[in-house]
A protein has these predicted regions:
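Beta-strand-turn-beta hairpins that frame and shape the catalytic cleft
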Residues: 1-8, 128-139, 174-178, 245-251
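N-terminal active-site segment of His-dependent metallophosphoesterases
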Residues: 1-71
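Extended active-site neighborhood of metal-dependent phosphoesterases/phosphodiesterases
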Residues: 66, 71-165, 173, 226, ...
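Conserved beta-sheet core of the metallophosphoesterase superfamily
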Residues: 77, 198-277
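A short C-terminal boundary segment appended to hydrolase-like catalytic domains
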Residues: 274-298
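Active-site neighborhood of phospho(di)ester-bond hydrolases with catalytic His/Asp-centered motifs
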Residues: 9-11, 53-59, 85-91, 140, ...
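Active-site-proximal loop/helix segment associated with metal-binding centers of metalloenzymes
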Residues: 17-27, 137-211
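Active-site environment of divalent metal-dependent phosphoester hydrolases
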Residues: 14-19, 62-67, 89-99, 144-150, ...
Length: 298
């Protein structure tokens, strides 16, 4: 059994078929390109390579295309990480952008499952995986609520069937010493007053509606986590680096890992689980998005 387990936690990669293709989400200064190259740089980062597990909490691809999934798995394979990666889909992986329908069609879900299967990965949710003899992962699919408007495909829902099955899995593994739940959508977006008190930017109403699970699902998820003493819930979707405790449950969000921050760095979370004490330490790792230029010699 491992005495310490390290987890590199990435999210919202938004990989494209090639680096010339821009990300679908608009930004103030144009659409982001180069996500694939950024992911390659992240996979070469020494702390990530030394980790026991690499977790990607959704939005692996930008449009859910199989060509994007193939690019993801080829980069993972080239990095020698296929046997220690855990992946789950996000709303972009079950992609139905625009107002053409409210819920994803069966072929969209089938395409996401096929993308996971390309890497020989679990695709039926919830799934359970043991790591290092001490850690148990419980992965949940929340990318199944469809569009709430023509501007949003981001709403998350777990559903009662999956919640019941998650509860059954947690009961079966109730004696596992360390448990983590993986999900794409956030189980909590603070009210504006709470955000201001923390010194954070308050989320607008539409952001809170789109970036977190619906009220029933998020309360059930947090209740299950509390009852079965889950160490933390790891998520993505907000594109922010977050770490907070809600109702006694630690909730940690990874940033959009292939999107450079204001300093030009790519970011991911590095979690360390101390098996003997049960302590979970978490920090944000930063990787320059572009290699440093050699100094000019005069």
């Amino acid at each position: 059994m491992y005495r310490r387990i390290t987890i590199a936690h990435l999210s919202d990669l938004h990989l494209a078929a090639d680096d010339r293709t821009p990300r679908s989400e608009a930004r103030l200064f144009g659409r982001l390109r180069g996500m694939n190259g950024h992911f390659e740089r992240l996979l070469a980062d020494p702390p990530l390579r030394a980790s026991d597990l690499v977790v990607v909490t959704g939005d692996v691809t930008d449009h859910g295309d199989l060509a994007e999934w193939e690019r993801f798995w080829s980069l993972v394979e080239a990095g020698g990480l296929r046997d220690r990666i855990a992946v789950l889909p996000g709303n972009h992986d079950v992609c139905c952008l625009g107002s053409r329908r409210r819920r994803p069609r069966a072929e969209d879900w089938a395409r996401a499952r096929a993308g996971l299967a390309l890497g020989g990965h679990e695709w039926a949710f919830p799934w359970v995986r043991s790591v290092g003899g001490a850690l148990t992962l419980f992965a949940v699919d929340a990318a199944n609520a469809g569009n709430s408007s023509g501007l949003d495909n981001a709403v998350g829902r777990i559903g009662r069937r999956q919640l019941a099955e998650l509860g059954r899995c947690l009961l079966l593994f109730q004696d596992a010493p360390l448990k983590l739940i993986l999900i794409h959508h956030s189980p909590n977006i603070p009210h504006p007053a709470t955000s201001r008190r923390r010194g954070e930017r308050p989320a607008a109403f539409w952001e809170r509606r789109a970036l977190q699970l619906d009220p029933f699902d998020r309360r059930c998820l947090r209740l299950l986590a509390a009852v079965f003493r889950v160490k933390a819930i790891l998520h993505g979707h907000t594109h922010d680096s977050l770490d907070r405790t809600v109702g006694g449950i630690r909730i940690i969000g990874a940033p959009a890992s292939t999107e450079p921050d204001a300093a030009g760095c790519l970011r991911y979370k590095l979690h360390t689980l101390h098996v003997d004490s049960g302590r979970l330490a978490s920090r944000t790792e930063r990787v320059p998005a572009a290699p440093a230029r050699p100094a000019r010699v005069h």
